[in-house]
C-alpha cells in the first residue's frame, strides 16, 4: 500500500512525539511492505508566528488530499493573550470543520503493569478497555446562544439540538466498532430530562434494532455513567454519546489509566482523511527536554492504520509493541512516578517500540 500521511507537529512537545510516531510508521512500512509518504505542515501557535493564521490554506489543502493526518499538539502560554485576534486552538477546530469530522473516538485502556498509576484501586480499574464515540458537531456547543437584559435581569441561553441524521451516523459508526470488539454498545443520554436526549434514545434504539440486532445494546443516563466510570469501569466496552456528555465523560475516564501520555484519539467523518492525535496538550514546560511520553501519539498512529488505512494487522503490531515495552518496565517520567531510575527519554521509548516491531 502507498499512502500519503500529513504530519502536523504543532507546538510544545508536538514535534518530539510526532517524530517518534513517524519512525514507528517507517518501521511498520518496512516490515509489512508498504510505502508511507510523509509531509509536514504548520498548525497552531507556530503557524500563527509564521503566517498569522493557526491553520494556513496550504495545510488545509494538504490535509484534504491526504489519506490520514497525525497531529502532535497545539497551544501554549506564548499565545494566551486574551486580546489576540486568534488562538492556536482555533486551528484544530477549523481543521475538524473543514474535513467534516463528526465522530471523536477515544480509547481508554489500562495496561495491567500500570494499574498502580491509576487513582483507583487496582481491583476496580483492572481490565478497563473502553472505546468512546463522542458526537463532535452537534449538540449544545453548536446551538443558538445569546444574552438579553441587564443587571439582575441579565439572562444567557444556549440551545441544544440534534437531528435524526446526526444521531444515526454516530450510532452506526459505534455499532460497527462494537461488532469488531465484544459486540456490546452502551448509549449515554439524559432522556429523563432533555428533549434532544429523548430523540437520541429513540433514534439510537431504532438503528440498533433494525441494523444491528446482533449487538448487545443498553442505555445509561449520563449522571449514572459518571458514577459507573468510578466504581465499575471494566464492565463497559463501546460507549456512544453526544457532544457535551462525551466531552465530560471522556475527560473523567482519561484519569483511569493514570497518565494522559498513554491515551490516543481519532476524529473521523464520512470518508475522507481522519485526524489522529494524543489527548494531552502541548506541555511547553517540558518541550525540548526529551522527557515527553510518545506512546499516546504512537498509539494514535496505530488508530490511523486501523481506521483510515484499513491495516488492522499493522495496527495490532504497534499496539503489541507498546504493550511489550511497558511489560519490559520502560517508563517515561510521567509513568515512572517516584522511581525515576526506571525512566527513559522520549527517543529511547520510541526506539524501544521500533525495536519490538523489528523483532
UniProtKB/Swiss-Prot annotation:
Q: What is the lineage of its organism?
A: Bacteria, Pseudomonadati, Planctomycetota, Planctomycetia, Pirellulales
Q: Identify the enzyme class.
A: oxidoreductase
Subunit-structure text: Homodimer.
Which residues of the sequence carry a binding annotation for substrate? Answer: 96, 106, 134, 223
Domain of life, per lineage: Bacteria
Question: What's the Enzyme Commission number for this chain?
Answer: 1.1.1.85
The similarity annotation says: Belongs to the isocitrate and isopropylmalate dehydrogenases family. LeuB type 1 subfamily.
Which cofactor is recorded for it?
Mg(2+); Mn(2+)
Q: How is the cofactor bound?
A: Binds 1 Mg(2+) or Mn(2+) ion per subunit.
Q: Where does Mg(2+) bind?
A: 223, 247, 251
Gene3D superfamilies membership: Isopropylmalate Dehydrogenase
**UniProt keyword Manganese present:** yes
- Record-level Gene Ontology MF annotations: 3-isopropylmalate dehydrogenase activity; magnesium ion binding; NAD binding
Site-annotated residues for Important for catalysis: 141, 190
Q: What is this protein called?
A: 3-isopropylmalate dehydrogenase
Amino acid at each position: 500500500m502507498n499512502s500519503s500521511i500529513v504530519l502536523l507537529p504543532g507546538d510544545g512537545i508536538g514535534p518530539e512525539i510526532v517524530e517518534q510516531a513517524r519512525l514507528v510508521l517507517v518501521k511498520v512500512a518496512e516490515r509489512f511492505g508498504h510505502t508511507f509518504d510523509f509531509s509536514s505542515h504548520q498548525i497552531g501557535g507556530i503557524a500563527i508566528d509564521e503566517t498569522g493564521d493557526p491553520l494556513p490554506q496550504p495545510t488545509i489543502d494538504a490535509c484534504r488530499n491526504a489519506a490520514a493526518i497525525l497531529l502532535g499538539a497545539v497551544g501554549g502560554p506564548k499565545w494566551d493573550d486574551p486580546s489576540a485576534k486568534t488562538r492556536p486552538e482555533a486551528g484544530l477546530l477549523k481543521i475538524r470543520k473543514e474535513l467534516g469530522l463528526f465522530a471523536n473516538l477515544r480509547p481508554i485502556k489500562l495496561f495491567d503493569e500500570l494499574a498502580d498509576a491509576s487513582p483507583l484501586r487496582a481491583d476496580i480499574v483492572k481490565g478497563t478497555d473502553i472505546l468512546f464515540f463522542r458526537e463532535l458537531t452537534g449538540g449544545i456547543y453548536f446551538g443558538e446562544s445569546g444574552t438579553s437584559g441587564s443587571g439582575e435581569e441579565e439572562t444567557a441561553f444556549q440551545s441544544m439540538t440534534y437531528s435524526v441524521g446526526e444521531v444515526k451516523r454516530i450510532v452506526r459508526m459505534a455499532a460497527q466498532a462494537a461488532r469488531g470488539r465484544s459486540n456490546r454498545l452502551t448509549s449515554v443520554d439524559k432522556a429523563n430530562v432533555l428533549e434532544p436526549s429523548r430523540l437520541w434514545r429513540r433514534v439510537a434504539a431504532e438503528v440498533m434494532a433494525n441494523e444491528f440486532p446482533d449487538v448487545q445494546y443498553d442505555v445509561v443516563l449520563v449522571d449514572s455513567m459518571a458514577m459507573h466510570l468510578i466504581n465499575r469501569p471494566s464492565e463497559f466496552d463501546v460507549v456512544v454519546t453526544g457532544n457535551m456528555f462525551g466531552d465530560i465523560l471522556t475527560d473523567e475516564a482519561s484519569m483511569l489509566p493514570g497518565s494522559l501520555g498513554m491515551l490516543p484519539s481519532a476524529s473521523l467523518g464520512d470518508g475522507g482523511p481522519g485526524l489522529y492525535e494524543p489527548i494531552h496538550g502541548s506541555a511547553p514546560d517540558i518541550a525540548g527536554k526529551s522527557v515527553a511520553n510518545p506512546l499516546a501519539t504512537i498509539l494514535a498512529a496505530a488508530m490511523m492504520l486501523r481506521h483510515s488505512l484499513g491495516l488492522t494487522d499493522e495496527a495490532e503490531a504497534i499496539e503489541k509493541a507498546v504493550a511489550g515495552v511497558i511489560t519490559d518496565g520502560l517508563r517515561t517520567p510521567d509513568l515512572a512516578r517516584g522511581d525515576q531510575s526506571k525512566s527513559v527519554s522520549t527517543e529511547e521509548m520510541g526506539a524501544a517500540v521500533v525495536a519490538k516491531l523489528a523483532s
